[in-house]
Amino acid sequence: MANTLPPTDRSCDISQPLERLSPDESLKAESDYLRGTIALGLLDRITSAVPGNDIKLMKFHGIYEQDDREIRDERRRQKLEPAFQFMIRVRLPGGICTTERWLKISELACAHGNETLRMTTRQTFQFHWVLKQNIVPLIRGLHEVLLDTVAACGDDSRGVMATVNPQFPALQAELAALAKTVSDHVIPKTRAYHEIWYGEERIASSEPEEPFYGQTYMPRKFKIGFVIPPNNDIDIYAQDLGYIAIIGENGKIAGFNVAIGGGMGRTDKAPHTYPRTASVIGFITPDRLISVTEAVMGVQRDYGNRADRSRARFKYTIDDKGLDWIKLAIEDRAGPLESARPYDFTSNADIYGWIESGDGFHHFTLFIENGRLNRDMLDKIAQIAHVHKGHFRLTPNQNLMIANVATADKPEIEALLRETGLIAFNERSVLRLNSMACVALPTCGLAMADSERYLPDLITKIEGILTRYNLQNEPITLRMTGCPNGCSRPFIAEIGLTGRAPGKYNLYLGGGFHGQRLNRLYRENIGEPAILETLNEVLGRYATERLPDEHFGDFTIRAGIIREVTEGRFSND
C-alpha cells in the first residue's frame, strides 16, 4: 500500500546508523545472524561461562547464563569464578505438551539440570542449573521429541500463548492451532540454531537469511497471545500483541479484536519507564492473522527505539508516536481494521479440579505452586503420563492441566491423582490458588529480593489475616517478583509485590480482578512487618466497607485507598 503516514521522529530507530544506536544493535548486526562465536565458546573447558557478547546472543537461542548468587562472594574470596550455570527455556506454543514430550522433558531435567522443572507464566518449561557441557545434550534431547528453544528469549517474538479453557473444546483446539501457526511464522529463519546445537553443516544460499527480521531483529522482546473470553487467563492486556477471539452466532471464531502495546516491565526510580495495558484498536477475520501480525511487528521493528533499550518495548513506541499514528501505520501495511466488537472478561484465574468439556472428555487442572516441579512431583506426574492417552496443557498461571481424559479413563487418572497425593495440591486457600511468583534468587541476575522461595511463607501469614476478617473465600489476585521487570505480571494484580532489596518490596494495590487495570504503588521499599500491617489495615476495611460482589482491587479505588491508573504512562504520578 502507498505510504500515507504523517512524518514522525526517526532519530532513534532502525533508519539511523548503528553507531548512533545501542551497542546491542551493532552486536546483532555483526553476529552473522546469531552465530557469533557461540560454537567456539562451548568448546572452552577452562571456564564454565561463555564470552561476553555470546551471552547476549545465546538468549536468542533460549539460553540465559546465570550463577549461584548466594555463593558469589565466597567464590570471589576463594579466587574462583562464579558458579556459572544456564537456564534454558523451551518454545511451546499454547503450552501444549504430549505425554511423550513430558516424559522426555522430565528425563532431561533430571539428567542435565537440578532435578526440577519450572513451568512459566508464558506456558512453557525452564530448565535450571544446566552446566555448559550439558547444554548440547539437553537441546539434542529436546530435538528427539521435536522441541526446541529457538527465540524463547531475545529480541524476537517469544513463545505465543493461548487460552486453556476446555469448556470450549472446539474453539480451544482452533485457537491453539492458530497460535502454533503464528508462532511458526514469526520464528527467526536463521540456521544458526541448527548449526550450533545439532551440528548441521552451513550451506551457502542466495536467499535472505532473515527476510522479516533482518540483521538486527526486533528492538526488544515481543510477546503475542490468543484468548477466548470470558476467561482472560493469558492476561491479554500484558501482551505486545493480543488477539481476543470473538465468537459468531454459529459458535465458531468469527475473528479477533486486536490489542496492542501491553507490557509489564519498569525500572524503579526511572519515571520514563512504566507498565502498560494493551489498547484494543480494531477487529480482523481469521484469514488476516498473519498479515496483521507481520504489520504490527513490522511497525515496531522499523519505528521502535533502538537507542535506549529502557524505552525499546512496543508500549513506548505507541505512547511516543501516539496510538492513532501507530494504527495508521499498521493499516498502511495490512489494510483497514474493522471496528472492535463487544466482549467481556470475568476472571484471569484457572479453574481447578475436573471439568467436563461436553465432547466426551474430562480435564483436570492441578495447582503447582509457583510452577516449580521437584523430583518427587516429576516422578508422580510421570506415572500419569505413562497411562494418559491425552496430553498436558501448561496454564498461564503456572499450573498443569491433564487434558483430554476420556470418560472410560477418568477413574484410572483419578486413582493415580489420589494414590500419588497430587490431588491434595488443590486443597489450598483461594488466595494461594490465585497467586504467582517469578524465580528470582538465587539464580536470576536481575532479582533484588526473593520471590518463589518467599511467597509461600508470606501467603501463609496473609491467610491468617483473611481468616480474621472472614475473607478466606474471597478470590484476590496476589503476585510477586524479585525485581520490577514483572515476569509474573504483578502490575495487573490486585496485590502486587516487587523486590527492591533483600527482604524489601514495593507494595502495589488496585489492579483489576481479571487483569484489565494496572495497580499503583502504595508503599515503597517495605519489609514483611510493614507488608502485613498494611494489608491487615486495608483488608480489614474491605471486610466491613465493600459492596456486594465487589472485588478487592475495585474496592481500594472506590474507597479512596489508591488512585485508579487510567494509562500506564501516568502510573508513576
Curated annotation (Swiss-Prot):
One of its GO terms (biological process) is cysteine biosynthetic process. Binds 1 siroheme per subunit. [4Fe-4S] cluster binds at C438, C444, C483, C487. Keywords: 4Fe-4S, Amino-acid biosynthesis, Cysteine biosynthesis, Heme, Iron, Iron-sulfur, Metal-binding, NADP, Oxidoreductase. It catalyses: hydrogen sulfide + 3 NADP(+) + 3 H2O = sulfite + 3 NADPH + 4 H(+). GO terms for cellular component: sulfite reductase complex (NADPH). Its cofactor is siroheme; [4Fe-4S] cluster. Siroheme binds at C487. Its EC number is 1.8.1.2. Pathway: Sulfur metabolism; hydrogen sulfide biosynthesis; hydrogen sulfide from sulfite (NADPH route): step 1/1. The keyword Hydrolase does not apply. GO terms for molecular function: 4 iron, 4 sulfur cluster binding; heme binding; metal ion binding; NADP binding; sulfite reductase (ferredoxin) activity; sulfite reductase (NADPH) activity. Component of the sulfite reductase complex that catalyzes the 6-electron reduction of sulfite to sulfide. This is one of several activities required for the biosynthesis of L-cysteine from sulfate. Alpha(8)-beta(8). The alpha component is a flavoprotein, the beta component is a hemoprotein. Belongs to the nitrite and sulfite reductase 4Fe-4S domain family. This is Sulfite reductase [NADPH] hemoprotein beta-component. It comes from Nitrosomonas europaea (strain ATCC 19718 / CIP 103999 / KCTC 2705 / NBRC 14298).
